[in-house]
Structures are given as C-alpha cells and as structure tokens.
Amino acid sequence: MMVGSSSEKKIPLYDEQNDYINEDHISEFAKALVWQDYDDVSTTAPTTPLNGPLDMGDLSLLGGELGNGSDDVVVGDDDDDDDDDDDDDDDDDDDKTKYSSPQLKAAQEINDEATEIGAVPATTKPDLISSKNDWFPINSENLNPNSKRTKFAKSSKSSKSKSTSPIRALQNEFRNSASFTLLRWPILTFVVIWVTILGFLYLAVRVYVALLEYFFTWTGERKRLRDKLRQSTTYKEWIENAKELDKYLGLDKWATNPKFSYYDSQTVQLTINKLKKARLNNSMPELLILLQGCLKRNFAGIENRQLYSHMYYGTKNLVQDYYKEVVICINKVIESNEINSETKYKFFKTVLQNFGKSALCLSGGACFAYTHFGIAKALLDQDLLPNIISGTSGGGLIAALLCTRTNEELKKLLVPQLARKITACEDPWYVWIPRLLKTGARFDSVAWARKSNFFTKGSTTFEEAMAMTGRKLNISTVPADPHSPVILCNDITSPHCIIWSTLLASSAVPGILNPVVLMMKNPVNGAVVPFSLGSKWRDGSLRTDIPIDALNTYYHVNFTIVSQVNPHISLFFFAPKGTVGRPVSMSKRKTAKEKFASFRGGFIATALEQLFRLEIKKWLQIVKSLDLLPHVLQQDWSNVWLQNFTGTITIWPRNRLIDFWYILSDPNEKQMEEIITKGERSMYPKILFIKNRLSIEKAIEKGRKTSTAELRETQMNVALASDDDEDYVPSDYSLAKFKDRIGVTSKDFDMLGSTLRDDDADADVDEDDNEDEDEEDEDENDYEEYDVEDLDDPYESDAFDPHIVLTKERRHTVY
C-alpha cells in the first residue's frame, strides 16, 4: 500500500520518456576513445593500465557488428611473434571452441589471419602504449614487468632516450638553470607558509565582520524584515518585502536625490530632456542623432553597479526615467513612417553594435552547479533569459538544456522532478572505487555520454541548437596538453560539434573524468567522427571558467550575467561596498542624516580584507609566473585561482556547510526543489538591473528585425543575411546610374557589349580552365559584395551613413 500510494503521487516530468540516445553515436564515441588512446604512442598525457581482452558481448559498445571492424587492425611488434607462436596456437584452439556462432567464428578467422601478419585485430582491445589517464606518468614503472608492453619499452628505451615529451621539453627549457634548481623549493616552501599565514589572517577578518553584523547590526525589527525578505517565494513578493525593508532603513530617500558620484547625473538629465523634446516635436532627424549618441554601453555611467547597491530594490529615479524615455523613443523610430526602411536598418544595425549584447555565463562547481537551474528559472519567468549562454563543467549541462529547449519546454522542465534525470553519480562506492584505481577517474565517459543525451536533446550540434531555439550555446573546453590554447565551442568555432561530447570534455576534471575526444557530425554525409583530429579535451574551468573575452570576440558581448557557484571562489566574496540588491548594512542613525555610504565592517576591516586577499593573489601570481608549482596530473593548478570569475553582474548563491557533503552526489526531488528555490532567491536582487539593460537591448533588436522585414518587402531581389554578424545593406545600384557615372550612352554601351560577346565567341578556353573559373565563381559568390549608396537624407548622421562595402564573409570552421 505504501509503495502504491507513493507511485500514485509521483508527478510526471515533461518529455521524461525520451532519452534521445543514439546508440550508433555512442558507439563511435567509445571507439574514438579506445583507438585514440592506442594511437598516442608519443602522447604527453599520463598512461592507463593495460586493457584486457575484449569480451565479445561488449562489441556493440565499440563498433556494432563484428564484420564492420574487421579491417581496423593495428600493427603490432614483429619481434614478439616468433617467440609466442606456440602460445598463440594454443589460444587459437581455445578461442575456436569458445565461439560457435557464425559471426563469432568469422571474427575468430579474422583474428587468426591478423596474428599471422603480426597485427592486432579490431575485435581485441589493444595494449595501450599510452593514453589520457590523469594519474600515472608516461612509461609508468607500475607496469607488469613480464608484459609485452614493458619488454617493448625496455627494448626501445635506448633509441628513444634522447626524445622527451613536448611538455617535459617546455618545462626543462625554463627549469634548466642551476639557480632555479637550487632556489625553487626553498622559495615555494616560503610562499606556501606565508600564504597559509595570510589565509588564517583573512579568515579572522571575515569571522570578525560576520560576528559584528550578526550580534550588533541585524537585530530586532531589522532582522525580522531581512528574514522575511530571504523567505520570499515569488519575485513579486520579494519586491514588496524589499521595499518594506528599504523604507524601514530609510534607504528610499537615496533614490530621490539624482546626484551621485558614480554616474553623470547632469548628462543623463540633459539627455532625457532633449529626447523628450525631439519626440514630442516629432523631429525624427534630431531623435536619431540623440539616440545614436546615448545608445552606448554604460552611457554616462548608468550601468555602474553602485547605482543598484544602495537599496534592496531600486536605483536612482533619474536612471529609471532615462531607461523609460529611451525605450519610448526607440519605439517611436520603429513606428515612424517618415524614415525609410533602409535608413532604419542602418541605424539599428549601428546602435546594436555600439550598445553590445548580453550573455548568461554559468560557472562550474560540481553539484553546486545545479543552482543554475533556479537562476535560469527566475530569468525565464521574467522573460529576461539572454540568447547567448555559456557554461563550463557542471554549468555547461544547464546551458545545454537552456539552448536546446524552447521557453515553453523550459517552463515544464525546470521543476523538482527534473532530479529524476540527473543520475551522473548513481554508481555506489564499490563500483566507482575500483574504477578509480584502475582508470584514474571516478566516472565512466561512455556512461556519462548516455546520461547527458536528455539534456542535449540527443546528438544535437551547436548549429542545430541555434536553429531550434535561436540561442547561441558556448561550452568552454581546454586541450589535455596544458600549453595548448582554450577553445570556446559554439556555432562559430565548431558548428558541427556534438554538444554532449563537449559537456563531457568540459567536465573532465583530473580524478573525476578522464579527457575525452570531441565528436562532430560530418557536414557532408552526417557521419559521426572525431573533432579536431581526435585530440582530447578536459575541463575548461581549469583555465577559463567565465570566457568573457571570447564572448566579446565572437558575439560582441559586453554585458555579462555570471552565476558563480565554485566553492573555492565563493569563499572570497566580500563586497566591501555592497553589491547589486545587497547594500552594506548601516544604522538608521546614519540613514536619517542621509549618509548612505559605508564600508562593510568599517574601514579598517575592509582595508585588512583587501590587503590579505590581494597579498594572497600576488604570491600565487608569482608562483605561476616563475613556474614554481609542480604540474600535478599534467596540469598547472595555479590557474584555478587566478582567473576572472566575475562579470558585469555576478550572482553568488549561498552555500551551507552541509552542502559540501553532497558535492558529488545526485539530488532527489526534495533537494532539487530547495536548490531551485535557492537559485531563484539569489537572482531576485539582480533582476531590476538586468531588466533595465535588456529593455533597451530588446527594443533595438525589435527595431532591427522590423526594419529588416520592411527592407525585404521593398527590395525582394536582395537577400539579407539573418545572422547578426552577416547582415548587410542592399545597394540601390542601377544600370542607369552606372552609365551616367562612366559617361557612356546606351548606344556605346550596347556596342561595348557586342564587342565583348564577339571576343568570347572567338576565345578558346580549355575544360580545365572552365572548371577553375567555375570554382572561382563559387568562391566569389561566398564573398559577394554589396555597395551601400548614399540615400541623400538630410538628417542622416555620418556615423551610420558611410560609403562602405559590406562583405558577407564565410565563417571559418574546423571540420
């Protein structure tokens, strides 16, 4: 009865019955892992234990039917064949008696033929010379001394003694001096001791500030109102509670005074007055010029975080008036019939480039990353989810879900029942501990590939995801080689790359998951093949957790919303001057005197906190610059602390001490409900800032789309690119204008054309030349140019009226 009643209460999850797993794609991924490891004879990565013989029951995992892999043989060592002929004959007899089905017998015959030529057939796991295991060094001494692999290594040791791995060579180039050898470890020991002392001092300052606020600041009615604010269940309820707390503390008076040192209030007020005057007078030329001047990132400092850090909800009234007036004026331009469609198009394209775009960046952080579900839900409920989303490690899983589902689907999926699809850590200890000891990783790559397919909607590529939802997904990964550059996988750098393979690579933390091969769909035939020549990739958070620079390069992003849940970074979040939606607590006595600025914990405590934190960072930077830290597991771990982990807006969800116990465990539905709620409440204080920014961004995007549609209607013969980076303005070129410019009459032009036709008829062109010309024509079509003619509008500003040639360029991709 108990089981039946619980099953009846089970709430179904949208699309729960679909796992979207393509077994063929998983099989190709598994084969790529195996064969890539075998081919890496001179790899710079550590090695794995030897693979055992392949069980015939597992062949579906490595390539499907037996006959399909019969030609995939790897040449072995010829020297060992003669010595082991008798043993091979005995093994063959045993194998023939073991495999009786026709397919297995055919596979055995292939094995016999391969043995005669000194090769290892594809139906047997190869003895890996080296692979991407994170725990054991190259040519590990832990190998079995009686194995063929060890004998081969010893026999070839003399011939390879002079060769070293690229990583070791790079290290030796900078570590070969006598002074470095002599002073490295003493300096490193001193730094470790000194940083440890600084860490204890930093902890003491933080404890002092926390106790001061707990016992002296947040007491009585103030504490009751703050607790009420923290327990808000909806954003509307949160706004009401925040306004009540602001009124009690007297912070609402701060919003009425337009003067503030962190932005130019006079410029903002003057801009509002001029925009309103031009709009009311219906002076469209002046309105266009004014809008182009103010539609820029952080105009007059209105995007300064301090404007939102002095109240729990709200900012300066003047700032709110500015955003409202600008949006009204943009809509006025969109609806105006006095401006032709081409002028509108050029105007909105220009201001969109000046204003920039917004992006949501989700950090890594193991199971803490599930807090991003609540962050995304809060943005989705307010229709504020950006179209550009990046994710790293655990954050990549949430980013993939957001970019492969529509808004309607996400509203059905971002619920506690989603926990039933999160099974990455379901293996018990007696399963993953042997795997960790054997492979150097707690989790299995192929198993994770299957489990991630639901979140990526199967083997969806970056290009396909953008076509489905209009969102641009970005996953940060780094090569297994620590000296290779980071790649941000997206629809530009890797449009055909399969998303779930990048998720595995972005989660490949040493000891958790071994580096994996990225997979892609061949754009010609759709076959799944390794990406980037089969190189292996690992967790991007090791070097680039928040790829702000790359997002700016690819998508012109200059406003980032960062959800930061990395536990080793959250510990150092202090906000001495307050942060968005969380002002520094101060007494009512100060606010009554209209003194709204104060350092958290006082000036001395803030100064000490800054001193100790920056001192720790300085010594870590010295260690990295001098290359003093050993590269444990072939990784420079100093990058984990020295990255840029923040954005324009950074959300720091609160973590309890008990949460660290579940850092590598799957949440149940109750825990998932708490996690989503925690993420939503962390997002509420930031929504107003984001809403103001996106109100202008959405209005500009609306104008761009509207003007593009109008231009298509008026000039149907010109194809406009739908992508932001490939938009171009059509030309008003005509044959009559061309004749007037070159000074010829229609009769002269016809004579010139007749002469050219006669020359073409007499020309003797080879077939090879024709083919070359056809190929050149195709290339020219890909780079077709469109001239922009002057519209002779009296009000058009020079900034968006250039005589330029816009080129539709081919995207550079790596297949």
Curated annotation (Swiss-Prot):
Chain ranges passing through the membrane: 185-205
Catalytic residues of the enzyme: S393, D539
InterPro entries from the UniProt entry: Acyl_Trfase/lysoPLipase, NTE, PNPLA_dom, Triacylglycerol_lipase_N
Record GO biological process: lipid catabolic process; triglyceride metabolic process
Membrane topology: Single-pass membrane protein
Skewed-composition ranges (Polar residues): 41-50
Sequence motif: GXSXG, positions: 391-395
Stretches with biased composition (Basic residues): 148-160
Major place of residence: membrane
Record region (Disordered): 41-105, 140-166, 753-815
Comp. bias intervals (Acidic residues): 74-94, 759-799
Ranges where the PNPLA domain occurs: 360-552
Pfam family name, one: Patatin
Subcellular localization(s) per the UniProt record: Membrane
Composition skew (Low complexity), residue ranges: 54-73
The keyword Transport appears for this protein: no
A GO CC term assigned to this protein in UniProt: membrane
Keyword annotations of the record: Hydrolase, Lipid degradation, Lipid metabolism, Membrane, Transmembrane, Transmembrane helix
Molecular functions per Gene Ontology: triacylglycerol lipase activity
This enzyme's EC code(s): 3.1.1.-
Family named by the database record: Belongs to the PLPL family.
Task performed by this protein: Probable lipid hydrolase.
Protein name: Patatin-like phospholipase domain-containing protein LELG_00944
Species, as recorded: Lodderomyces elongisporus (strain ATCC 11503 / CBS 2605 / JCM 1781 / NBRC 1676 / NRRL YB-4239) (Yeast)
